[in-house]
Amino acid sequence: MRRGRNSLLDGRMVSAPPDRIAFDRGVLTRVREADVADFIGAAAANAERLREWIPWGDDPAYRRERIGGAPVDWEQHRAYLYALRESDDGAVIGGFSLHRRVGPDGLEIGYWLDAAHTGAGLATEAVGVLTAVALALPEVERVEIHTDEGNTRSAAVPRRLGYRLARVDAFEVRTGSETGRLQIWVTP
């Protein structure tokens, strides 16, 4: 695992996570320009399922904008998008990300997994590894995961990893399955 580099963001020094993170059942690799089409294809193949919980899940233009902007977001230290693959040259089977939108000392993890790979603990394993990587960055004191109260499968991931439910906030519903109650899970 190669350490990321340091940069200034909003007048403070921040560290980028590594471009590649290998673990027992997969590898998380930074989404670069060359990866965008494969990532979009994997997300599109899961659009029907993702649209229940992710606003860009069923909107091809929004999906292209969000995923297509990932390389720039990484360079500007706004967010770090990873493709999950079973091997370095394997197909994209999920998306995992770190976002700098929860305050200067925290990162938020987001994730989705291809339907054929759910139910076997792979998301939990990948999020666990990504949590450790995030907490190893010198400026990061906490990691958050935000899940809709109705998305029990997604909420099971932070629960299994020992995150604590810090609060439940109201939010504007953007998809058909959302409840408008956002669970904020925080590392202990």
Where on the chain are the PLM-derived regions?
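Acyl-donor (CoA/ACP) binding surface of acyl/acetyltransferases
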Residues: 1-38, 42-52, 81-188
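A short helix-loop-beta-strand connector motif used in the catalytic cores of GNAT acetyltransferases and
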Residues: 69-83
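A generic alpha-helix structural signal
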Residues: 40-43, 67-71
